[in-house]
């Protein structure tokens, strides 16, 4: 009873403070820290990893929710080691991790009291979020928590345009009950696991084709988060310009402003920190036949192009069902880490350089230095800056294996 009263009071206070969001000093400091880190690793892991067909397998194959839920009784990631994950990611030069606490399949990867459909009811029986939180805090890696607004399993979730073949009874939809469920889960995550640096939402687009606009009641939910942890950032992968209460702007599979994948055509709002999320291979969740990994040079150039837009790169890996990270993904992390140890000063703590020449030269800058990144296949013979200044690279005309950098004092 006391827990219920406390939650209701917290939500009431959050509702009252949802209007005219003003970030706290702690939140503004978190925004700067986030932007300075520039590189994070996304981890999509849930029951779907066992099917090895990607994170949307449940809805793509129209699997009945009750039948799908039985897979939890076989989930036993006996080789999972949170400290090893975090160590590998830190060695890669990443400053934060974003982990899927609950994806669209509705399975919770922590010890939640709000549903029996969670990691503690599996043969594994250990709180994955707890282990990751402890490892991140020990190794000074920021922890961001992905949370889906969609649930293909719960009948109280008002179905949108996905998950329609999972056998839920649509007559049982109950938005107030589902909204309360989500807020209770978010309260658990923000009160039981120490410092959480960002809540990363996904799924708003599930109702973007409704004839009557769907009210997700986001301002109140965002206010709840900020009340529980004022420094915690809020981001939402809704593919729209930021809504009130959000602290970062997210772009899916695209560098801000480019929209080549067709998911991120929203206007870039430079008043907030920016983040691009992208896959290391093709899928977000583990797919056994997806070996289409991007080369290390491609990933490094993506990081450079993203930083040159003043944005962070959130690079995804889909862990395997046994709890290990794929060998190729680990190799790419090591290769990126090697490059960042030599060149991280041109990425970390920088902002958009403002100088772009064609497709082959982009830039970052700090207080007194402009870093010209030559990312074309060949190093140019000379570079003319907008100011008229001409620079002749000492390796002009040579093959460019990755990223040739020229530092220009301002």
What are these regions (language model features)?
Residues 10-18:
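Hydrophobic h-region of N-terminal signal peptides that target proteins for export
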Residues 1-4, 89:
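Positively charged n-region of N-terminal signal peptides that target proteins for export
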């Amino acid at each position: 009873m006391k827990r219920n009263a406390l939650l209701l009071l917290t939500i009431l206070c959050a509702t009252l403070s949802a209007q005219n969001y003003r970030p706290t000093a702690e939140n503004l400091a978190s925004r700067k820290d986030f932007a300075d880190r520039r590189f994070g690793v996304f981890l999509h892991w849930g029951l779907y990893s066992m099917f090895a067909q990607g994170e949307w397998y449940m809805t793509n194959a129209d699997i009945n929710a009750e039948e799908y839920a039985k897979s939890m009784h076989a989930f036993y990631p006996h080789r999972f080691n949170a400290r090893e994950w975090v160590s590998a990611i830190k060695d890669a030069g990443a400053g934060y991790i974003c982990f899927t606490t609950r994806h669209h399949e509705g399975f919770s990867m922590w010890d939640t009291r709000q549903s029996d459909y969670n990691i503690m009811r599996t043969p594994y029986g250990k709180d994955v979020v707890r282990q990751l939180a402890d490892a991140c805090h020990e190794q000074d890696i920021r922890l961001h928590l992905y949370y889906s607004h969609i649930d293909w399993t719960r009948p109280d979730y008002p179905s949108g345009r996905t998950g329609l073949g999972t056998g839920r009874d649509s007559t049982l939809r109950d938005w107030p009950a589902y909204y309360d469920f989500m807020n209770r889960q978010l309260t658990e995550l923000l009160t039981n696991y120490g410092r959480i640096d960002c809540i990363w939402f996904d799924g708003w687009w599930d109702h973007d084709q409704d004839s009557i606009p769907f009210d997700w009641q986001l301002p109140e939910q965002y206010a709840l988060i900020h009340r529980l942890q004022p420094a915690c950032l809020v981001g939402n992968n809704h593919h729209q310009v930021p809504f009130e209460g959000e602290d970062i702007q997210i772009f899916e599979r695209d560098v801000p402003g480019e929209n080549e994948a067709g998911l991120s055509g929203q206007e870039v709002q430079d008043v907030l920190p920016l983040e691009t999320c992208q896959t290391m291979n093709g899928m977000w969740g583990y797919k056994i036949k997806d070996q289409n990994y991007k080369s290390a040079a491609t990933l490094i150039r993506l990081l450079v192009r993203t930083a040159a837009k003043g944005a962070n790169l959130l690079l995804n890996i889909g862990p395997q069902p046994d709890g290990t990270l794929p060998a190729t993904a680990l190799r790419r992390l090591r290769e990126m880490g090697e490059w960042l140890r030599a060149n991280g000063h041109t990425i970390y703590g920088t902002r958009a350089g403002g100088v772009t020449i064609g497709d082959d030269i982009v830039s970052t800058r700090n207080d007194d230095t402009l870093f010209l990144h030559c990312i074309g296949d060949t190093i140019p013979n000379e570079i003319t800056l907008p100011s008229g200044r001409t620079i002749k690279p000492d390796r002009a005309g040579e093959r460019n294996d990755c990223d040739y950098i020229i530092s220009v004092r301002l």
